[in-house]
Amino acid sequence: MKTNVPAVRIVEVAFTGYPVTDIERAKAFYEGLLGLEVAVAFEHGGRHWIEYEIGGTTLAISNMSSEQWKASADGPVMSFEVENFEEAVEALRAGGVKFLVEPMATGVCSMAVVSDPDGNSVMIHRRNR
């Protein structure tokens, strides 16, 4: 990699995207269980793109996946800050969600990692205040 070239000037993170295979199943998880509200949605030829505005961040889910963009527990993790960690864990357990990392308390937060219906890792998080 060359080091004497102009730097890319990133101004913000536009969105984080998760590929999904079954859009209705994904919507049941993100909208029904997590309570996210759709900000933008479009469909073309049976392929969907849905965005959720969360604070100053956007999460996109899409079944417009390809060989290069597949669901994986090994990819990046979006961490959702929740109002009440214990209640969130109870709701996820009641919803039958698989926990990849069981709920734990650290010196700075409480957190757990769950799997969405396609196997993407999602963190539930609450900062100690």
Language-model features and meaning:
Residues 1-15, 37-83, 87-117, 126-129:
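Vicinal oxygen chelate
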Residues 20-23, 44:
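Conserved beta-strand-loop-alpha-helix junction that forms the acyl-donor binding cleft
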Residues 24-25, 87:
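Alpha-helical macromolecular-interaction surfaces
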Residues 26-31, 92, 119:
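Conserved active-site tyrosine of GNAT-family acetyltransferases
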